[in-house]
Amino acid sequence: MRRHNSMMSVLSGLLAVGLVVGLSVGSALAVEPTDNTGAGQSATQALDSLEVKGRAPKTGYKRTQFGKAWADVDRNGCDTRNDILNRDLTDVKHKVRTHDCVVESGQLHDPYTGKDIAFKKGWKTSTAVQIDHVVALSDAWQKGAQKLSQTKRTELANDPYNLLAVQGKANQKKSDGDAAT
């Protein structure tokens, strides 16, 4: 069941990010109808007539353009990193007097590797479990996020549908690749 929930989170995240970026830049990418797009033309024929372009360059990309890392965008008193750890870990133990916000330890069933990983907050141990942007921020930048407002980019960077707690090594290997990496 947990694996199903993680996969649904990934799929929902991809859909949400696609909609946000697509709707935000859609008007800039609108194509004027050509003479060969008649009422009787099929969707396939219309799509076949469109020019396919590659992604934009990373020119100007900086992580800071997506706002403060792990902001409390939902204003629940808990930063996004701890929100995701609370959602994705089991057997969670919290730091005292943090209103069940700051995760001290827990268990992760990694959706990427299938491994079970013990999480313990600490300077040398927290990297075992990292939070992955399923659609990496630099990838989103190249696919239209550079046209979003600062507020929308911060929301995108902290969108729980685009975030998963994962094994640190798997996250490092994926790096800023796209969701298919």
Where do the language-model regions lie?
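Short amphipathic alpha-helical segments with coiled-coil-like heptad repeat character
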Residues: 1-4, 83-87, 175
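Secretory targeting and sorting signals
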Residues: 1-31
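N-terminal module-boundary/linker segments of secreted carbohydrate-active enzymes
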Residues: 22, 27-78
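Residue-level marker of positions within ordered structural domains that often coincide
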Residues: 24, 82, 172
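Secreted/periplasmic proteins that engage bacterial cell-wall peptidoglycan
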Residues: 57-130, 134-135
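Domain-level detector of nuclease and nuclease-like folds
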Residues: 112-181
